[in-house]
Curated annotation (Swiss-Prot):
The lineage of its organism: Eukaryota, Metazoa, Ecdysozoa, Arthropoda, Hexapoda. Component of the exocyst complex involved in the docking of exocytic vesicles with fusion sites on the plasma membrane. Keywords: Coiled coil, Exocytosis, Protein transport, Transport. Belongs to the SEC6 family. InterPro entries: EXOC3/Sec6, EXOC3/Sec6_C. It comes from Drosophila melanogaster (Fruit fly). This is Exocyst complex component 3. GO terms for molecular function: SNARE binding.
Length: 738
């Protein structure tokens, strides 16, 4: 870096600092103070610089000394390497000169080994027989010692042959043939150990020393295996039969004994007992719990700690049980067997009844995982739901058909507190509730899936039910003499539909998780379906009643009507007769039918009023108005009598009096009366009003239309529209007045 440039930058920085310090006149008095402070700072920086430079120089000095030492070491190493190279030039000559000595050393080593093993070489057969006898007499430690002596002799001799520069295969074959019975003894001892270990749990209860002896032998063989493998890495020689891996053998034997124990627990098949799976699983639970208790209390003290025998046994039982149950699942389950299997796998097995029992305290999920693989468990759940769905479909199809057949019988429906009903709704939801209670013992997600599926099936049942109800109605109205108790069964259908809605809502309260929003549309669809059935059936009740009154509605606002009250009297008597049956409706349904009956009666009466059957002068219209109001009041009194507990405020029957009042109004003030009326009933149209004033022959239709149009143009939209306004939307005439 340019020193002059640095100096210039420092100078500029100093000038800038001075300018900042001497901005006010009063600061000139502190110039001497600033100068001393900067001088001290400069001295401090110079001292730091000198210290840094000194440190750098010391480092360089030390580095140079180390380089000098390294150079000296390199020269010394080079000198000694030259000396070693000079000495090694004579080694080949010495090696050739010692060839005879090496041969003699090899022979001496072989002879020494042979001398050490002469007893075993010449007494192989006797030693083998002795060892076999010891095995038969269960003197396993002595037998193993004899076997070890024989194997050591054979292995030492084979190792001497292995060390020879010129190896002859025939020598090895001869030696191995001489000791071939040793392998037979080893195999016999292994069989004996397998037999003992296959009965480990039973033996531990009676004589644990037998197991301890077997484990001591296995541990010795494990050490011999390790030594042989280590020797192979150094010399390349591995004795015959090594490694024996008897520890792995013992684990295989124990695992096989566990599998045999599990498979041997099955006592019955499905053909023998319907509860075979429940009994089988309970027996397995008891066996596994007792066996693992024995393992923890008796095996753990006998086995070496590094075997982790309790953990191994837990794994063996887990794997064996998993395979056993998987085979049962693959062979196919039926009915409640699905629930028994899933509940046992998800709750009983990992719970306090088995693995989490205080005597065992095994954390299955953390240590060994699930008993059935998640995909297998999900497949099991899907099969269970499919099976449940098939059962629901079959039962609900039969239920719908049974209900349909009952409608055509000549027996009155059952009553519950005077209300007609059938048992189908309760049975359907009891069946669903039973299934959901069962799935709740497994896990909530399965319960939710079962609930959604149940709702979907009930909705399908509802669609079939609605179709049958429509067919019933059409069949009845083609010939009303065919079905004797049509009204009674329609009442039953209304009550059943309401009960289905209530039971569905109760089911939702019990089982629908508050946090779940998916599939909620299925539940809403179910409610809508049965509300629709309820509404249809209620309308059929009134349709039948009003069909009987059709001719009397046709007599309204005719000359016959003016002369007598027969038409209205008959209408009231007919309704009263039908409402005697309607008392078998549940209170909510009765109120709905009452409201619909008022609405329908008002609509039919107003339609007759607007049907152009009368045309009278202004003087006679007052009497007509009074008669209309009297009949409207009579209708209201009739409904108050048959339904005293139901409020009739804002009744659609009030529309009759409201319209009749227009017949007596001054035609000049009609626009004012229409303002309020049209604001409350916007569906009241020009055609309706013109037809109403047809009764007054002193008013021309054109004049009425003009005033109605004026009222409609000047009317203001009201905040509140009367709820009975919809009646006018349903009154439509095909004939035109102009």
């Amino acid at each position: 870096m340019d020193l002059q440039q640095l100096e210039e930058q420092a100078r500029q920085a100093a000038l800038k600092d001075i300018q900042n310090m001497l901005q006010r006149p009063g600061q000139l008095e502190k110039v001497e103070q600033y100068r001393h402070r900067i001088a001290r700072k400069k001295a401090s920086v110079e001292a730091l610089l000198k210290t840094g430079m000194q440190g750098q120089l010391d480092g360089v000095r030390v580095g140079l000394k180390q380089l000098e030492t390294c150079m000296q070491d390199v020269r010394e190493v080079r000198r000694r390497m030259d000396e070693v190279e000079r000495l090694l030039r004579g080694v080949p000559e010495v090696y050739d000169a010692l060839e005879v000595v090496r041969e003699e050393n090899t022979k001496h080593s072989q002879y020494a080994t042979a001398m050490e093993n002469l007893k075993h070489i010449f007494n192989v057969d006797a030693s083998v027989q002795k060892t076999m006898a010891l095995i038969e007499d269960d003197k396993l430690l002595n037998a193993h010692q004899c076997l070890a002596d024989l194997e050591n002799s054979r292995d030492d001799l084979l190792y001497e042959l292995h060390k020879q520069p010129k190896q002859h295969a025939s020598d090895k074959i001869t030696l191995k043939r001489h000791f071939e019975k040793v392998d037979t003894v080893s195999q016999e001892l292994e069989k004996k150990l397998r037999l003992i270990l296959s009965r480990t749990l039973n033996t531990l209860r009676k004589k644990p020393t037998i197991i301890v002896t077997a484990l001591r032998i296995i541990e010795r063989e494990e050490k011999n295996d390790q030594f042989a493998l280590q020797q192979q890495k150094v010399t390349g020689f591995l004795p015959p039969g090594r490694p024996k891996a008897w520890r792995r053998m013992i684990m295989d034997v124990l695992q096989q004994s566990v599998i045999t124990r599990i498979e041997g627990s099955k006592l019955e098949e499905r053909a023998d007992n319907k509860m075979w799976l429940v009994r089988d699983l309970e027996i397995l639970r008891q066996i596994i719990l007792e066996d693992l208790r024995v393992v923890k209390s008796l095996c753990v003290p006998c086995f070496p700690p590094h075997y982790d025998i309790f953990g191994e046994y837990v794994k063996f039982y887990h794997e064996g049980l998993s395979s056993y149950l998987d085979n049962i699942v693959r062979s196919g389950l039926e009915g409640n067997e699905y629930v028994s299997m899933m509940a046992w796998v998800t709750h009983t097995y990992p719970g306090v009844e088995l693995m989490s029992h205080p005597d065992l305290n095994v954390d299955v999920h953390r240590q060994i995982g699930t008993l059935l693989r998640p995909e297998h468990l999900k497949a099991l759940e899907d099969e269970y739901l499919q099976n449940m769905q098939r059962n629901f479909q079959e039962w609900m199809t039969k239920a719908a058909e049974t209900e349909k057949q009952e409608w055509f019988t000549e027996t009155v429906p059952d009553q519950d507190e005077e209300y007609y009903h059938t048992s189908a709704p309760v049975i359907i939801f009891q069946m669903i509730d039973q299934h959901l209670q069962v799935t709740n013992t497994i896990h909530q997600e399965l319960t939710f899936k079962a609930l959604v599926m149940s709702i979907q099936q009930v909705e399908i049942f509802g669609q079939t039910y609605l179709k049958n109800v429509i067919e019933l109605k059409e069949h009845h109205f083609r010939n009303r003499d065919q079905i004797k108790y049509f009204t009674h069964y329609i009442i039953t259908i209304v009550n059943n539909s309401q009960q289905m809605v209530e039971l569905a809502q109760q089911m939702k309260q019990l089982y629908w998780p508050k946090s779940r929003t998916e599939h909620y549309e299925d539940f809403e669809r179910l409610l809508a379906t049965f509300q629709r059935i309820r509404a249809h059936a209620a309308s059929y009740l009134l349709e039948e009643a009003f069909l009987d009154m059709e001719c009397h509605f046709n007599d309204l606002f005719t000359a016959k009507w003016l002369a007598s009250n027969i038409a209205v009297d008959t209408i009231c008597v007919t309704l009263d007769d039908y409402f005697q049956d309607y008392n078998h409706l549940r209170p909510n349904n009765f109120e709905m039918v009452i409201n619909e009956a008022q609405k329908l009666l008002a609509k039919r009466y107003i339609r007759a009023l607007l049907s152009k059957r009368l045309s009278k002068p202004r003087a006679e219209c007052d009497a007509i108005t009074r008669k209309i109001k009297t009949e409207a009041k009579r209708f209201k009194l009739f409904f108050e009598k048959i339904a005293p507990k139901i409020s009739l405020s804002d009744s659609p029957l009030d529309l009759i009096s409201t319209l009749s009042a227009l017949l007596s109004s001054d035609i000049e003030l009609l626009v004012l009366d229409l303002h309020t009326l049209l604001g409350s009933y916007p569906s009241l149209n020009e055609d309706h009003l013109v037809r109403l004033f047809y009764i007054r022959n002193d008013v021309k239709a054109a004049e009425v239309r003009e005033k109605v149009q004026d009222a409609m143009k000047s009317k203001k939209a009201m905040v509140s529209i009367a709820k009975q306004d919809c009646i006018f939307k349903e009154i439509v005439f095909s004939d035109k007045l102009w």
